[in-house]
């Protein structure tokens, strides 16, 4: 199925659509690695909708997800690990979250005073232990701990074709999207897409989105023109029509502005 046809099943802004586009354009994926897998449903969606032959590695830090991930392993033979993922092998202490979805191993995410210890593994160590075969596509949903995971995945990234990363936009301390971008750009990845923009409920400002990266050696963009001839003709017609519409609105907008300025001067506005 081609990328346009897939959009009938998965709209353009879904988390799975960029992966579909990559695969449909010849990007090879052997293993899907989900760091922050929760109950494993996203990886199941990838297998069900994209390629049932993909290998999986589900990873989550919390025991509460073990029964779901163990069931996937028992029925499909796809391994899982219950461990935090970071830049060292050992343990770390984390703050207990208000909901299991929001567990973060990142120290900058704030202290609650209620902490507990978790095992911690580098992604490189886990992939070697499981025997992961590349090229890999990696999903990271780790609540602010993205840089730690990436720093412990140097070897894995060398055999990775793409990544889907929940990316923060923060005013508070901690890594930003630009830090993630710079780290991956230095390792020959390019930004491929951005989906699922999320906005703060209090003031509607952007606080996170999912960034998609592609390994430069697999980047297919540029092989085809920006648009087909038919699409280009449609765009030209649309922008011509839009300009005429905007020009027609100029007198009304000027009149409205003059009226509002007059009201301000007289104290009525």
Regions found by a protein language model. Give the residues of each.
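Phosphate/nucleotide-binding beta-alpha loop and adjacent structural elements of enzyme active sites
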Residues: 1-269
């Amino acid at each position: 199925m081609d990328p346009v046809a897939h959009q009938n099943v998965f709209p353009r802004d879904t988390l799975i659509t960029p992966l579909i586009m990559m695969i449909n354009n010849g990007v090879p994926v052997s293993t899907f690695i989900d760091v922050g897998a929760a109950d494993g449903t996203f990886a199941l969606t990838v297998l069900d909708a994209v390629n049932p032959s993909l290998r999986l590695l589900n990873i989550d830090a919390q025991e509460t997800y073990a029964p779901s991930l163990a069931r996937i392993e028992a029925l499909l033979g796809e391994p899982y690990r219950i461990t935090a993922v970071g830049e060292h092998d050992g343990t770390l202490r984390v703050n207990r979250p208000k909901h299991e979805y929001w567990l973060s191993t990142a120290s900058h995410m704030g202290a609650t005073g209620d902490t507990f210890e978790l095992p911690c593994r580098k992604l490189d160590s886990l992939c070697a232990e499981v025997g992961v075969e590349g090229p890999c596509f990696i999903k990271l949903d780790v609540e602010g701990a993205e840089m730690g995971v990436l720093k412990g995945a140097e070897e894995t990234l060398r055999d990775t074709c793409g990544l889907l990363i929940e990316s923060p936009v923060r005013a508070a301390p901690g890594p930003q999207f630009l830090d993630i971008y710079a780290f991956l750009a230095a390792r020959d990845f390019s930004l491929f897409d951005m989906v699922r923009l999320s906005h703060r409920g209090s003031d509607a400002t952007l606080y996170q989105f999912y960034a998609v990266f592609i390994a430069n050696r697999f980047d297919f963009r540029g092989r085809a023109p920006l648009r087909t001839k038919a699409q280009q003709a449609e765009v030209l017609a649309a922008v011509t029509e839009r300009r005429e519409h905007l020009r027609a609105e100029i007198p009304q907008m000027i009149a409205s502005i003059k009226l509002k300025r007059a009201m301000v001067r007289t104290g009525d506005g």
